[in-house]
């Protein structure tokens, strides 16, 4: 594939006769160092280093700006970083391509006014409606200092991380398998929003396509045998809550696939859904040329309830293993794949996974537990990160197995890793932390298996949700916090009050004492929908930067003010109330792909 790249534009004072010549080496070193920083620290979702393209010439005026723009046009450059140690000619040298995301790094030195060019060119970007990110070091450097200060590196990497995410999703597809689940508003896929804000094509595949491929045998039969053997060896069955129940005929007559054949059906379904999303060259060899192409997916979702799950095994295993960083073939890139085809949460899964590199965990935002309610029900008050209360995140049977927190880093900390760092021991630990409970036939008449685990780790995570609001458009919510490892007495009592066959995570947001983060209750009360996503690490700042690139306002977040990084023009919409300025700026500039 032609990867989305960061174009590095070395901009220079165009005066020949001593000025330009004296700056050539320093300017190109800035470009080379920026490219090296990006490629050594950032990876694409497939695990390969992010690629940069350095301009074929320093840019002293419009002719050279056009020459570099032509060079970039053949390289899938989706964002540009202009770098300079000196004064240059603003509108003669700036990136005027409306289709690239832009940043400018002006060197903070006294010998040459790189900061003056930075200010001048940012004014030009604002005046021309081409917002750019500003990068300017906090401390003055010597002219011969080639190091990149930490604060500058942080901004370069934050910009590049967001730009690569935007480029990665562009021209790919959200694949809806099925339609709307139980009237859930997030399941109403808004093709216009996907196209205009993300550059994503909306595609729909009826669930009957899975049955067609199972019936005819349109899947890799060798891989099916391998996957089924792996499942039987590694996916231990857990609690069956149907035992001892006297189920009515409306339920018993509805299960078409015999219980002892569930795994066979589910494994075939999983292979087929993966093939629908991504294609499979093996199908081409089998003569199924159209099916081999796939749908060019970057994210997807499965309806399930109720037209499928009322008579066929559910997709809980499929959804869980797709979103995990491994399967029967070993480590793999996680697929953002939404339960109940909640398109909005699928988009949140995609955004979170792209900036964090971790598996996206889909959750029902189920219950807020105050310390007082917890003590009343369990006899104990929570402490530690859960001392102010916690939110029960529990999906109806599926979330990425990485969310168990079973992976351990070199220091013994429980973590979620990018797939390229997953070891056999990590995979085994996640599988051992998970059992697969038979679905509750009263809710899932067709049966299936739920991925059941308890996150027994205190990990930094970020919860997010993408919503669409009439009159505003798309918005993003962000809550950084931690997972909590509650005492057994608390966990067991509360878990049994919901559904003990589902995956449970106890989430404790970081509180600020203000607004939606006044207390844990306020976070729950201001959440925009019944679903949310967690990804590993505190990546709220990266999500804010990416959202500003896509022109999506952030409705609530608890990211420290000094970490918030948006295009410089946002300051022209107000500096006292940054949230209001974000709304106005996003409305003014409109979606990225109008």
Which residues does each predicted region cover?
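An N-terminal assembly and electron-transfer interface module characteristic of large anaerobic redox
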Residues: 1-594
């Amino acid at each position: 594939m032609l990867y989305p790249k960061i174009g590095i534009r070395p901009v220079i004072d165009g005066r020949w006769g001593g000025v330009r010549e004296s700056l050539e080496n320093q300017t190109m070193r800035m470009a080379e160092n920026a490219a090296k920083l990006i490629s050594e620290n950032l990876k694409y979702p497939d695990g390969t280093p992010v690629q940069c393209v350095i301009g074929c010439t320093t840019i002293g005026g419009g002719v050279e700006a056009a020459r570099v723009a032509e060079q970039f046009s053949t390289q899938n450059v989706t964002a540009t970083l202009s770098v300079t140690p000196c004064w240059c000619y603003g509108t003669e040298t700036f990136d005027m391509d409306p289709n690239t995301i832009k940043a400018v790094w002006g060197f903070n030195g006294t010998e040459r006014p790189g900061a003056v060019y930075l200010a001048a060119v940012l004014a030009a970007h604002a005046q021309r409606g081409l917002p750019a990110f500003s990068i300017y070091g906090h401390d003055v450097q010597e002219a011969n200092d080639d190091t990149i200060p930490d604060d500058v590196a942080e901004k370069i990497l934050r910009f590049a991380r967001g730009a690569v995410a935007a480029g990665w999703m562009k021209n790919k597809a959200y694949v809806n398998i099925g339609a709307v689940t139980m009237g859930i508003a997030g399941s109403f896929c808004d093709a216009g929003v996907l196209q205009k804000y993300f550059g994503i094509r909306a595609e729909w595949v009826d669930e009957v396509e899975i049955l067609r491929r199972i019936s005819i045998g349109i899947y890799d039969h060798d891989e099916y045998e391998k996957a089924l053997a792996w499942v039987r060896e590694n996916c231990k069955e857990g609690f069956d809550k149907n035992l001892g129940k006297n189920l009515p005929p409306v339920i018993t007559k509805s299960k078409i696939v015999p219980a002892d054949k569930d795994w066979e059906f589910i494994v075939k379904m999983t292979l087929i859904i993966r093939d629908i999303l991504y294609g499979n060259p093996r199908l081409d060899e089998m003569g199924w040329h159209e099916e081999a192409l796939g749908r060019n997916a970057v994210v997807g979702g499965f309806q399930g309830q109720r037209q499928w799950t009322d008579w066929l095994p559910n997709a809980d295993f499929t959804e869980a293993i797709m979103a995990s960083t491994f399967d029967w073939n070993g480590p793999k890139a996680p697929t953002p794949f939404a339960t109940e085809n909640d398109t909005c949460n699928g988009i949140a899964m995609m955004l979170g996974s792209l900036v964090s590199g971790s598996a996206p965990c889909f959750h029902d935002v189920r219950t807020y537990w105050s310390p007082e309610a917890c003590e009343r029900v369990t006899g104990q008050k929570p402490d530690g990160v859960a001392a102010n209360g916690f939110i029960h995140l529990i999906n109806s049977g599926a979330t990425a197995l990485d969310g168990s927190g079973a992976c351990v880093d070199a220091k013994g900390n429980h973590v979620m890793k990018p797939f390229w760092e997953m070891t056999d021991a990590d995979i085994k630990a996640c599988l051992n932390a998970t059992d697969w409970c038979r679905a509750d036939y009263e809710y899932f008449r067709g049966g299936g298996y739920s991925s059941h685990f308890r996150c027994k780790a205190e990990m930094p995570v970020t919860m997010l949700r993408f919503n669409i609001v009439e009159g505003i458009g798309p918005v993003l919510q962000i809550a950084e916090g931690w997972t909590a490892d509650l005492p057994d007495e608390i966990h067991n009592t509360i878990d049994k009050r919901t559904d003990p066959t589902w995956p449970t995570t106890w989430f404790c947001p970081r509180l600020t004492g203000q607004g939606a983060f006044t207390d844990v209750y306020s976070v729950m009360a201001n959440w925009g929908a019944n679903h949310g996503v967690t990804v590993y690490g505190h990546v709220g700042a990266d999500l804010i930067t990416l959202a500003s690139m896509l022109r999506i306002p952030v409705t609530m977040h608890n990211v420290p003010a000094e970490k918030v990084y948006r295009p410089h023009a946002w300051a022209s919409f107000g500096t006292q109330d940054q949230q209001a300025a974000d709304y106005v700026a996003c409305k003014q500039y409109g979606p990225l792909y109008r």
